[in-house]
Structure formats: structure tokens, C-alpha cells
């Protein structure tokens, strides 16, 4: 039986679910860029890509060399293809304008080029997160500068989302709004091959992911929930839980997507003016779309993440996502 490559899968989606051809091509271009990033990540010190650039991004975070390289790879791969009206990156202050020498398309691409890049130098799994939106008609004029407002759509409007994880294997997890598929990069073939079909997050779990060192800064509902988890079989939840924390959202969410669990990155008292740490557009929305399509849930503690209307490109948000039963429990604690 022949293996199903990403290209074949996307063609079959065009036939069975009327996936537009330009969206199919866009996903393939993003996947090719992810293969190039994977190659750069795997070379590590041999490629001279480790270490800091000595600059900061719009988030005030120190940029790693691979942050900048990954960002450039995604921009250069996608700017010429004619599928996009514009792009937005976690590493850039403003939307990226498609150069006038290239045709424009009907979609917007939003991405975190290298999530978890602080782990690069210690050889921990990192990844690329991306989200695809339709560009509103009023912003499609070929001659106008694309404004930030075109991107400020709730997560429910996403037409596709995915992430690539660069670990022992390079994998691409993808949703087009009809479930989640997992593809593994076959380096001999040079293609992503379907290896995980119809991924489903278990409703309940015995694992959780959170940075426990921040416990003293959490809000009361989060403290209560985690204390109940730690109480184990003798506590109110009646079972023992294991904690896992990699400090790379892609790696933590990938584990939860494949074997269940709950990922938590709550707001805390150190920066009370900020509603959270993670970026809504670049991280929370695409990951929430993927998790929901796999049968899980995602909230900011009080509201479904995909229902949040962004106010700016770099808006932050608290995140609780994963197994539905656990996410509903902690969301309920916030409501009390």
C-alpha cells in the first residue's frame, strides 16, 4: 500500500471537501519552509546558527539567530507564491507587505517562526506554529498597504492551522477544519508522510503541564486546581497526576495532543496589566483550533479562546488547553 504524502492528502481534500487549490498550495509552501527550518535546526552548532543575535523583537524578547533565520525562510518562501495578501510574524512589529513585483492572493498567514527558541542551545524540541485566515474583501486592493486591522479576526475564522515540531523526528500537525492529521518528514523521500490519522485528545487525563516555579504569582482558581492535582488519589479528584513541563509550547502541546493532558500558562501577579504571556494570534489561536479539532477544549479561564476578538497583532492571553474535562473544570473554578 502506497504511503500518503502531504501533497496527496491535500489533493484528496480538494476532491472530498472542496479545499481551494490556492489554500492547498499555501500549505505546501509552508511545509517546504518548515523542512528548510528543520534542516537548519538539526545542524545546530555545525551550521553556526546557535546563540543570540543581540537584538530584541517587538515582545521585548532576545532574538536567537534561528529566530531570525526561520522568520526569513517563511517570508521568502511565501511572498512570491501569489496565495497571500500579507503575513504577520511574532518577530515583526507590523504586517509584512507582499512586494509589488509579486501577485497577491486571498489569504493571510500568521506565524511564530520558532516557538521555544530559548531551548535551542540546550537541544530541546522547538517548532513553528502557523495560522491561515481569509483576507477580508475590503483589504484586498492590490495597490494598498495592508493594514493590521485585516488580521484582527477571532480564531473561529481560521481556515487552517498547524505546527511543525523539530524533535527526534520532524512532524507536521495540521487541521483544515475537519479533524487533525499528523505527518512525519521522511528525509529519504523528502516529503511529509501521513502517519497519524484522526488524532483525538482523551477527554480526561492524569498529566498536566505548567511552570510550577510561578505558583506564588497565580490567581486563586489556578492555585486551587493545581493543589487538587498535587493532592493525588487522596485529594478531591481521586487520582494521581504527573506533571510535565518542557518550556516549549509546541513540545508540551504535542505531548498533550498525542496522549492527553492539560497545558496551562495562566496570567500572574508580576505583570497584572497583561492578560497573559502567550500571543493570541501566533500561538493561542492556532493551537486552540488544533486542540478543538481533536476533541479538546481551550479557554483563557473565562472565555473560549477562539471567540476572543483581537485588539492588536501582539495581544497576549492566558491559556488553558487540552483534555476537555480538565479544561472545563478549571474554567468552572474561574467562574466561581
UniProtKB/Swiss-Prot annotation:
InterPro entries in the record: FBPase_C_dom, FBPase_class-1, FBPase_N, FBPtase
Binding of Mg(2+) 1, residues: 90, 112, 114
Cofactor needs: Mg(2+)
Gene Ontology molecular-function annotations: fructose 1,6-bisphosphate 1-phosphatase activity; magnesium ion binding
Subcellular location per the Swiss-Prot or TrEMBL entry: Cytoplasm
Binding site for Mg(2+) 2: 112, 115, 283
Pathway(s) of this molecule: Carbohydrate biosynthesis; gluconeogenesis
Cited CDD domains: FBPase
A GO biological process held by the record: gluconeogenesis
Uppermost EC category: hydrolase
Co-factor note (free text): Binds 2 magnesium ions per subunit.
Keywords for the protein's UniProt record, in alphabetical order: Carbohydrate metabolism, Cytoplasm, Hydrolase, Magnesium, Metal-binding
GO CC, one annotated term: cytosol
Catalyzed reaction equations: beta-D-fructose 1,6-bisphosphate + H2O = beta-D-fructose 6-phosphate + phosphate
EC nos: 3.1.3.11
Binding site for substrate: 115-118, 211, 277
Gene3D superfamilies assigned to the protein according to its UniProt record, in alphabetical order: 3.40.190.80, Fructose-1,6-Bisphosphatase, subunit A, domain 1 (3.30.540.10)
One Pfam family recorded for the sequence: FBPase
NCBIfam families: PRK09293.1-1 (NF006778), PRK09293.1-3 (NF006779), PRK09293.1-4 (NF006780)
Family per record: Belongs to the FBPase class 1 family.
Assembly mode: Homotetramer.
Protein name stated in the entry: Fructose-1,6-bisphosphatase class 1
Source species: Pseudomonas aeruginosa (strain ATCC 15692 / DSM 22644 / CIP 104116 / JCM 14847 / LMG 12228 / 1C / PRS 101 / PAO1)
Top-level taxonomy: Bacteria, Pseudomonadati, Pseudomonadota, Gammaproteobacteria, Pseudomonadales
Amino acid at each position: 500500500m502506497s504511503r500518503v504524502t502531504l501533497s496527496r492528502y491535500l489533493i484528496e481534500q480538494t476532491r472530498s471537501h472542496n479545499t481551494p487549490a490556492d489554500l492547498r498550495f499555501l500549505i505546501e509552501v509552508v511545509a517546504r519552509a518548515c523542512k528548510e527550518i528543520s534542516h537548519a535546526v538539526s545542524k545546530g552548532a555545525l551550521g553556526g546558527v546557535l546563540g543570540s543575535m543581540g537584538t530584541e523583537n517587538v515582545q521585548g524578547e532576545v532574538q536567537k539567530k534561528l529566530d531570525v533565520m526561520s522568520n526569513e525562510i517563511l517570508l521568502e518562501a511565501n511572498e512570491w507564491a501569489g496565495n497571500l495578501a500579507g503575513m504577520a510574524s511574532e518577530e515583526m512589529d507590523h504586517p509584512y507587505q507582499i512586494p509589488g513585483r509579486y501577485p497577491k492572493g486571498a489569504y493571510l498567514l500568521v506565524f511564530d517562526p520558532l516557538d521555544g527558541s530559548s531551548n535551542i542551545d540546550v537541544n530541546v524540541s522547538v517548532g513553528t506554529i502557523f495560522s491561515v485566515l481569509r483576507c477580508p474583501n475590503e483589504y484586498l486592493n492590490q495597490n494598498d498597504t495592508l493594514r493590521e486591522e485585516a488580521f484582527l479576526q477571532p480564531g473561529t475564522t481560521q481556515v487552517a492551522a498547524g505546527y511543525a515540531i523539530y524533535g527526534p523526528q520532524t512532524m507536521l500537525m495540521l487541521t483544515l477544519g475537519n479533524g487533525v492529521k499528523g505527518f512525519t518528514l521522511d528525509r529519504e523521500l523528502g516529503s511529509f508522510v501521513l502517519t497519524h490519522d484522526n488524532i483525538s485528545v482523551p477527554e480526561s487525563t492524569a498529566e498536566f503541564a505548567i511552570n510550577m516555579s510561578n505558583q506564588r504569582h497565580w490567581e486563586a482558581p489556578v492555585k486551587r486546581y493545581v493543589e487538587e492535582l498535587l493532592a493525588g488519589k487522596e485529594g478531591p479528584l481521586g487520582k494521581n497526576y504527573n506533571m510535565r513541563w518542557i518550556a516549549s509550547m509546541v513540545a508540551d502541546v504535542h505531548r498533550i495532543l498525542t496522549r492527553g493532558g492539560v497545558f496551562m500558562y495562566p496570567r500572574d501577579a508580576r505583570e497584572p496589566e497583561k492578560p497573559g504571556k502567550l500571543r493570541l494570534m501566533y500561538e493561542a489561536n492556532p493551537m486552540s483550533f488544533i486542540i478543538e479539532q481533536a476533541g479538546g477544549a481551550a479557554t483563557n479561564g473565562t472565555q473560549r479562546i477562539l471567540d476572543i476578538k483581537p485588539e492588536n497583532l501582539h495581544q497576549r492571553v492566558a491559556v488553558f488547553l487540552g483534555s476537555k474535562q480538565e479544561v472545563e473544570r478549571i474554567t468552572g473554578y474561574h467562574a466561581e
